[in-house]
From Swiss-Prot:
PANTHER family: RIBOSOMAL PROTEIN S19P FAMILY MEMBER (PTHR11880), SMALL RIBOSOMAL SUBUNIT PROTEIN US19M (PTHR11880:SF8). Keywords: Ribonucleoprotein, Ribosomal protein, RNA-binding, rRNA-binding. It comes from the Bacteria. GO terms for biological process: ribosomal small subunit assembly; translation. Protein S19 forms a complex with S13 that binds strongly to the 16S ribosomal RNA. SUPFAM superfamilies: Ribosomal protein S19. It comes from Shewanella amazonensis (strain ATCC BAA-1098 / SB2B). Belongs to the universal ribosomal protein uS19 family. This is Small ribosomal subunit protein uS19. GO terms for molecular function: rRNA binding; structural constituent of ribosome. HAMAP family: Ribosomal_uS19. InterPro entries: Ribosomal_uS19, Ribosomal_uS19_bac-type, Ribosomal_uS19_CS, Ribosomal_uS19_SF. The gene is rpsS.
């Protein structure tokens, strides 16, 4: 269920301050964050944000198509290694 339009987008204040500081300074270093719940806003376009996935920070380069999505959508938390192969099928 999407967030109500009258409430506006959610973004953690500490992340917003880091984004504003990077835009003002023209800094291209990745911004480290644990805030997967924050929404991507237009001020973030062109920045690289390192989003924590529970184990490491995954660098995410923000483009204009990402606006309105959450940062956590671009940093997968689970790795799928495939199902175990059936040993009986291999012998035949």
């Amino acid at each position: 269920m999407p967030r109500s339009l009258k409430k506006g987008p959610f973004i953690d204040l500490h992340l917003l301050k880091k984004v504003e500081k990077a835009v003002e300074a023209g800094d291209k270093k990745p911004i480290k964050t644990w805030s997967r719940r924050s929404m991507i806003i237009p001020q973030m376009i062109g920045l690289t944000i390192a989003v924590h996935n529970g184990r490491q920070h995954v660098p995410v380069f923000v483009t204009d198509e990402m606006i309105g999505h959450k940062l956590g959508e671009f940093s997968p938390t689970r790795t799928y290694r495939g199902h175990a192969a059936d040993k009986k099928a291999k012998k035949r």
